[in-house]
Amino acid sequence: EDEVPVGAVIVKDGKIIARGHNRRMQNCDPTAHAEIEAIRAAAQRLGDWRLDGCTMFVTLEPCVMCAGAIAQSRIDTVIFGAFDDALGCAGSRANLPADPNVGGHAKCAGGLMKESCAEVLQRYFEKKRKE
């Protein structure tokens, strides 16, 4: 797949309940980010859009759309790898998942395996520039 290599998992009670990865190109859908895909899968699995008690792990800091969806889905914690200084909205540019003004209450922490996550993204974009 020729997608930006971002992946997300959602965990509840110590178990992975959903996974997602970017599928924008594959689905011709600008909303098919890893976080959105994982949120949709978790909601289906739990039979509830409220993802209270869940933690999301994602390789790249969520964008504004994904950060808003995280807030609206009531995920408790977001842990991400690489920071996105340009578009990140879970700490870099804003912190929407934690902002009560948009329904957020999540704790956000970035930098988990940030070098590895950033390297995967950097390699992908270097390859794309050569094509």
Give each language-model segment a name.
Residues 1, 65-131:
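Zinc-dependent deaminase
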Residues 2-6, 52:
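Short, basic and Ser/Thr-rich N-terminal targeting/leader segments
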Residues 48-60:
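Immediate flanking context of iron-sulfur cluster ligation sites
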Residues 26-36:
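A short, polar/charged loop-to-alpha-helix boundary motif
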Residues 36-43:
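Glycine-rich oxoanion-binding loops at beta->alpha junctions
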Residues 6-14:
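Short beta-strand scaffold segments in enzyme catalytic cores
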